[in-house]
Amino acid sequence: MNTKNLLITGMFAGLFLSCKEVEPPAPVLPVPTPEQIKWQKMENYAFVHFGLNTFNDLEWGYGNTPAETFNPTDLDCEQWVRIIKAAGLKGVILTAKHHDGFCLWPTKTVDYNISNSPYKNGKGDMVRELSDACKKHGLKFGLY
């Protein structure tokens, strides 16, 4: 009986020792780049469009709506970010200048911007406010 057990054990040992690791096959192209993989891991983001058309009830603006139209009285970017984070999104992308040309940040390059609106008496900067809120709450922030 011992000889039989020894023989069976020896056969299994020989079988397992003869197995060697085989290299996996080369991937079939195209293979995603590290940047593409990083992009996929970002998952869902909030894409925020908030500008002059929010206040003039138009679907499409042509750059002829006065900058004074932009006047959010209770804008709370932190509230947006808290809700976005609670919804499980990973970050926020803000349309900082839509097709109508209105800039949501103060700039000296064009007059059609937030500094020429009544929002915070012309001292507002929605890009900065949303960016700061994202940093505070640990979300990524991007601009479109």
Regions found by a protein language model. Name each.
Residues 1-24:
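Bacterial Sec-dependent N-terminal signal peptides
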Residues 21-144:
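Mature catalytic domains of secreted/periplasmic carbohydrate-active enzymes
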